[in-house]
């Protein structure tokens, strides 16, 4: 999958832009705060119908304007052209059209335009709470498996309903039994698919970390869940119900799962240096790309947002060699340093385009 053209109106700091991209390498240069990340976020929005930066929709419409528009012209691996048109109005539902036909549900769009982004905000994957790491697993699986996405949506709806019931003075245990049985069914599917995903993902991640770091450091991932002992969630919920009534929320379930990230058998967030953390993160995201490529129908678009800062020259060279190989498709790279991008371009013989971005304006 590649994007050939992107047209932007009133998205964040970008008042208007018309971009035509290389099918291989696209370099975006500009100082911080000029709009490089906003352009990448527009691409992310077209794939996932939300910002990578987890900001609400009303914050992506340019200040003082009523609506933002994003239009992307794509070409899939069979050679077919596809137009996406997304309109965003604060306080209203987003409207997404594919080849002029509106989606009834935005969730039906997820996974058809695969994209992987590596950015400074992704440090929360290592340093943040467990919800960040669950989101990582969920995003990958939702792109590949509509049934997983459906199970996750239904589980979260039932979880919200159970939490509401836990706060009520009157306890309806019969209704709670039914609700917990349904949650157990969805949770089993989520747990099983997360477990298989990590089993498939781990060797890919290990190989990439070794390639980038050039060291024998042992890294690993460990998936922890209340369901790991084989007890159905409905039974766990029934046992925890008295405690949960006191707490006012559900204290067990797949919404509490954890993905531990380990360096030498210890949580990397406790011992990792800045360089080790960054290498771990980039390896995770490139492994996400590889996994999506292996298990999806289309090669994802890869966005690398200011990832070379604080990495030594050797690791930068290894990353460039990896993503410059034939296994990667269309790539977008941002940097504040024009010299860095010139060196990257010089190492590639691929078709490339360079864009300079200043105060929300994009120059090619």
UniProtKB/Swiss-Prot annotation:
<dbReference type="GO" id="GO:0006302">
    <property type="term" value="P:double-strand break repair"/>
</dbReference>
<dbReference type="Pfam" id="PF02463">
    <property type="entry name" value="SMC_N"/>
</dbReference>
<keyword id="KW-0234">DNA repair</keyword>
<protein>
    <recommendedName>
        <fullName>DNA replication and repair protein RecF</fullName>
    </recommendedName>
</protein>
<dbReference type="GO" id="GO:0000731">
    <property type="term" value="P:DNA synthesis involved in DNA repair"/>
</dbReference>
<dbReference type="GO" id="GO:0003697">
    <property type="term" value="F:single-stranded DNA binding"/>
</dbReference>
<keyword id="KW-0067">ATP-binding</keyword>
<dbReference type="InterPro" id="IPR003395">
    <property type="entry name" value="RecF/RecN/SMC_N"/>
</dbReference>
<keyword id="KW-0235">DNA replication</keyword>
<keyword id="KW-0742">SOS response</keyword>
<keyword id="KW-0238">DNA-binding</keyword>
<keyword id="KW-0547">Nucleotide-binding</keyword>
<dbReference type="GO" id="GO:0005524">
    <property type="term" value="F:ATP binding"/>
</dbReference>
<dbReference type="GO" id="GO:0005737">
    <property type="term" value="C:cytoplasm"/>
</dbReference>
<dbReference type="InterPro" id="IPR001238">
    <property type="entry name" value="DNA-binding_RecF"/>
</dbReference>
<dbReference type="InterPro" id="IPR018078">
    <property type="entry name" value="DNA-binding_RecF_CS"/>
</dbReference>
<comment type="similarity">
    <text>Belongs to the RecF family.</text>
</comment>
<comment type="function">
    <text>The RecF protein is involved in DNA metabolism; it is required for DNA replication and normal SOS inducibility. RecF binds preferentially to single-stranded, linear DNA. It also seems to bind ATP.</text>
</comment>
<keyword id="KW-0963">Cytoplasm</keyword>
<keyword id="KW-0227">DNA damage</keyword>
<feature type="binding site">
    <location>
        <begin position="30"/>
        <end position="37"/>
    </location>
    <ligand>
        <name>ATP</name>
    </ligand>
</feature>
<dbReference type="GO" id="GO:0009432">
    <property type="term" value="P:SOS response"/>
</dbReference>
<dbReference type="GO" id="GO:0006260">
    <property type="term" value="P:DNA replication"/>
</dbReference>
<dbReference type="InterPro" id="IPR027417">
    <property type="entry name" value="P-loop_NTPase"/>
</dbReference>
<dbReference type="InterPro" id="IPR042174">
    <property type="entry name" value="RecF_2"/>
</dbReference>
């Amino acid at each position: 999958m590649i994007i050939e053209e992107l047209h932007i109106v009133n998205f964040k700091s970008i008042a208007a832009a018309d971009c035509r991209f290389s099918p291989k390498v696209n370099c975006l240069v500009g100082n911080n705060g000029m709009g490089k990340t906003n352009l990448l976020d527009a691409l992310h929005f077209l794939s996932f119908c939300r910002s990578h930066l987890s900001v609400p929709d009303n914050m992506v419409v340019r200040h003082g304007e009523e609506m933002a528009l994003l239009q992307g012209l794509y070409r899939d691996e069979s050679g077919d052209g596809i137009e996406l048109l997304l309109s965003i109005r604060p306080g209203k539902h987003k409207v997404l059209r594919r080849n002029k036909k509106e989606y009834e549900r935005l969730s039906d769009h997820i996974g058809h335009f695969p994209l992987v982004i590596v950015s400074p905000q992704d440090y929360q994957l290592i340093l943040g709470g467990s919800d960040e790491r669950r989101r990582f697993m969920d995003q990958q699986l939702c792109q590949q498996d509509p049934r997983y996405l459906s199970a996750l949506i239904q589980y979260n709806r039932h979880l919200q309903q159970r939490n509401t019931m836990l706060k009520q003075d009157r306890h309806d245990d019969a209704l709670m039994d039914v609700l917990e049985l349904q949650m157990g069914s969805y949770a089993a599917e989520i747990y099983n698919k997360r477990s298989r995903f990590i089993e498939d993902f781990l060797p890919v991640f290990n190989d990439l970390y070794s390639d980038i770091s050039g060291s024998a450091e042992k890294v690993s991932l460990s998936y922890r869940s209340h369901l790991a002992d084989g007890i159905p969630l409905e039974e766990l919920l029934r046992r925890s119900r008295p405690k949960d009534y006191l707490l006012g929320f559900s204290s067990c379930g797949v919404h509490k799962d954890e993905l531990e990230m380990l360096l030498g058998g210890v949580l990397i967030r406790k011992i990792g240096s800045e360089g080790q953390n960054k290498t771990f993160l980039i390896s995770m995201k490139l492994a996400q790309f590889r996994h999506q490529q292996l298990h999806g129908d289309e090669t994802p678009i890869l966005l690398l947002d200011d990832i070379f800062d604080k990495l030594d020259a050797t690791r930068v060279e290894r990353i460039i060699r990896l993503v410059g190989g034939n296994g990667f498709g269309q790539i977008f790279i941002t940097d504040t340093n024009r010299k860095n991008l010139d060196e990257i371009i010089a190492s590639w013989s691929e078709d490339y385009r360079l864009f300079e971005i200043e105060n929300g304006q994009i120059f090619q």
